[in-house]
Amino acid sequence: MIETFYEVMRRQGISRRSFLKYCSLTATSLGLSPVFVPKIVHAMETKPRTPVLWLHGLECTCCSESFIRSAHPLAKDVVLSMISLDYDDTLMAAAGHQAEAILGEVMTKYKGNYILAVEGNPPLNQDGMSCIIGGKPFIDQLRHVAKDAKAIISWGSCASWGCVQAAKANPTQATPIHKVITDKPIIKVPGCPPIAEVMTGVITYMLTFDRFPELDRQGRPKMFYSQRIHDKCYRRPHFDAGQFVESWDDESARKGYCLYKVGCKGPTTYNACSTTRWNGGTSFPIQSGHGCIGCSEDGFWDKGSFYSRLTNIHQFGIEANADSVGVTAVGVVGAATAAHAAVSAIKRARHKDAAQDTAATQK
């Protein structure tokens, strides 16, 4: 019998107070209101830890590198307490035939009740021989493990979209997971890599409510991918004011102006970078002075230079041409300034008249 998350925490000497605090912080990190805290507490107390099998295909392990750096919940809490991570050839102690034996045992014991997490993708060309796991093509392992999984998580842009190994002309025919496994519910968590707290947040939500979070039409969780980076970017006021960096060493760059003209893809990229940020909420690429490359969007690797600016963006809330933004902004600011001056003048006149009337009455 698998222990519940609460039982594991108590066994580790964690107090009830600390457990409740953890549940409250978890609700906050997921963007949930306080009314959900009792539900999280109940789930952590009663639901057994879910077995998770984590496979690796064609990838660079950046998703795992991001995952283990999660600040809340901590990766150690997720791996050692919240879930039962029974197979991950990068993190597990066993290797070789021992590791593959564990995979088979878990699949048999928890048939239909385990979550399959996939990092990377399978190559289909040459019968999948470009990626071999345990002496067999990864595509065979993927199909075998997916067969009895209750849900599948596609970690990162490799599993979600194909990423750089699927770049033209894609000689290995690297293929995203949803185009290979078509009969299972799949949640995509794109990014190269995804934000650590987004990864642990998705797992926490699934374990707590025993379902996927609400997904957008591309299969991404809306709680993390419903807004463009541009929408909450701290440099957005500079965009609206027509203040842009023209080259990397100009005065505008030193002042922290908008990076749109030097290739920032924030206006077309849906992710939580500008709100959740990276390294425990410390920063994100735009804050560090480099434009967004759109790494969570499908096909970003084949859309030209990262430093070529977007043109003719036709989305709500985005001006079609950055060159006209400054002119428009000047006009708006000028009109607003004139209106403000007129209102101020009227108020001063009224105040002066009122003062004169008061003085006359006192006489």
Swiss-Prot record:
The record describes its post-translational modification as:
Predicted to be exported by the Tat system. The position of the signal peptide cleavage has not been experimentally proven.
Q: What InterPro entries does its record include?
A: Cytochrome-c3_hydrogenase_C, NADH_UbQ_OxRdtase-like_20kDa, NiFe-Hase_small_C_sf, NiFe_Hase_small_N_sf, NiFe_hydrogenase_ssu, TAT_signal, TAT_signal_bac_arc
Q: Does the keyword Zinc apply?
A: no
Per the record, the gene is hupS
The UniProt entry lists the main location of this chain as membrane
Q: Which organism is it from?
A: Alcaligenes hydrogenophilus
As for membrane topology, the entry says: Peripheral membrane protein
> Can you tell me where the transmembrane regions are?
none
Name the chain's protein.
Uptake hydrogenase small subunit
Q: Which UniProt keywords apply?
A: 3Fe-4S, 4Fe-4S, Cell membrane, Iron, Iron-sulfur, Membrane, Metal-binding, Oxidoreductase, Signal
Question: Which Pfam families does the record cross-reference, listed alphabetically?
Answer: NiFe_hyd_SSU_C, Oxidored_q6
